[in-house]
Amino acid sequence: MLKNDLFLRALKRQPCSRTPIWVMRQAGRYLPEYRAVREKTDFLTLCKTPELATEVTIQPVELVGVDAAIIFSDILVVNEAMGQEVNIIETKGIKLAPPIRSQADIDKLIVPDIDEKLGYVLDALRMTKKELDNRVPLIGFSGAAWTLFTYAVEGGGSKNYAYAKQMMYREPQMAHSLLSKISQTITAYTLKQIEAGADAIQIFDSWASALSEDDYREYALPYIKDTVQAIKAKHPETPVIVFSKDCNTILSDIADTGCDAVGLGWGIDISKARTELNDRVALQGNLDPTVLYGTQERIKIEAGKILKSFGQHNHHSGHVFNLGHGILPDMDPDNLRCLVEFVKEESAKYH
């Protein structure tokens, strides 16, 4: 039995004594303890070494006091498992080779055996689960098909997604064949993560806002829905969070995937999202990460606004406090500790 199951209870919209909190990228460079581990190795080796991935996954639980751990990994391990070479250089960015630009390129990609190609993530999950010893839940995750598609086709990050959009608009069938292959891998991968001990899954669609509403409904949401439905068919008790960054105008469509929670960016008032979705899913978010550059007093004010905006909980509401995107590397860990402690104390009165 979990000693602290608030995160899972909130996702399932069950009564909680207070609002749980965790933070995207909580295992990361803002923590000196993470930097000490990272100095000894490169980023992908850290992801692929279960002992090290476990150590940095647990750091924010012990050092910051968050209510959930998220396995330390990267969304691009999926692209690598499918056959692209991935290089992540923190100062220079991300490179994938070869970029996928033709049907022949797509045909060369595989839907991998997850145990064989991504076994190191599963090992890290099992090891972390053991080390956590039921203190808090453990989150597994994957990038969404659209976001991984953009990296695959562009061969890295992009400002305008020119190659990805060209494929969409010139060769829509080709785009769908690549998205489908990526989606099959994501589904198999997330199911394996649950078997390895993940208590919840988050799907990150980091580049969701690159698409119009109509295109998002065609090229992104169906694949997210496929994964969510596959998880729900096999593991109905495992909550799924969908974080489609800055898609504030189609929250209802995101909820229609069957997910348990919708992650929000900071560009929408959480009360508006709650009203629109009418408590049919839990909400996660949505403090602007740059608030953590502020004074601790200001951090409390801004966090308090979100708690107040979400408002009083009822028997079918759920809120997981988080940032609207990942914590930035140069932030003061004491400011995150301040946020975590404040949310724990202040949120009780809304429950």
Swiss-Prot record:
EC numbers on record: 4.1.1.37
Metabolic or biological pathway: Porphyrin-containing compound metabolism; protoporphyrin-IX biosynthesis; coproporphyrinogen-III from 5-aminolevulinate: step 4/4
GO BP: any one term: protoporphyrinogen IX biosynthetic process
Keyword Glycosyltransferase appears in the UniProt entry: no
Site (Transition state stabilizer): 74
CC terms in the record's Gene Ontology section: cytosol
Cross-referenced InterPro entries: UROD/MetE-like_sf (IPR038071), Uroporphyrinogen_deCO2ase_HemE (IPR006361), Uroporphyrinogen_deCOase (IPR000257)
MF GO annotations: uroporphyrinogen decarboxylase activity
Entry keyword annotation includes ATP-binding: no
Binding residue positions for substrate: 25-29, 74, 151, 206, 325
Enzyme class: lyase
Enzymatic reactions: uroporphyrinogen III + 4 H(+) = coproporphyrinogen III + 4 CO2
Subcellular localization(s) per the UniProt record: Cytoplasm
Gene3D superfamilies, A to Z: 3.20.20.210
Keywords on record: Cytoplasm, Decarboxylase, Lyase, Porphyrin biosynthesis
Binding partners and assembly: Homodimer.
Function: Catalyzes the decarboxylation of four acetate groups of uroporphyrinogen-III to yield coproporphyrinogen-III.
Family to which the UniProt record says this protein belongs: Belongs to the uroporphyrinogen decarboxylase family.
Name of this protein: Uroporphyrinogen decarboxylase
Organism: Chlorobium chlorochromatii (strain CaD3)
Highest classification ranks of the organism: Bacteria, Pseudomonadati, Chlorobiota, Chlorobiia, Chlorobiales
Name of the gene encoding the protein in the UniProt record: hemE
